[in-house]
Amino acid sequence: MEQKKDKIVLHTCCAICSGYPVSFLQDAGYQVISYFYNPNIYPESEYYKRLEAERTLCSYFGCELVEAEYNPDEYYSAVAGLEDEPEKGKRCDKCFELRLRKTAEFAKANSIKNFTTSIVISPHKNFAKLTAIGEKIANEYSLNYAAIDFKKKDGFLKTNKIS
């Protein structure tokens, strides 16, 4: 009899960034659920290109894909007043918080105690900042934010090879 695996919801922004995290989490014994929620992606055609690539990746790895509704107005509301903020500033923090909060809400609604994000694999994203946001939200929802720095051990190189 196969042992039941813990589930983890992996917020995914694109197939390039999620390839290695999906593989890593599966190898660590998790049943991965890819949660594609990205109202910040523009134009809409780019959003659907990324979603289609994520579908292909999830099919390849045999993991479930949950496609959240594409609603850019949620993003614009979250970052209202921060339009002039530089990259890596407060606007980015609000966007990360929006996407991780939606991921946590999905996890909680489906009785899944673990969640994380593929965003941290980017060499342009701040692991400590994303971890702080994830852990804050996890505490609010009584969940576990898996603070895994997927960049370590050539993770970014590996994810590019997978994609």
Specify the residue positions occupied by each region the protein language model found.
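Nucleotide-activated chemistry modules centered on ATP-dependent adenylation/adenylyltransferase
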Residues: M1-S163
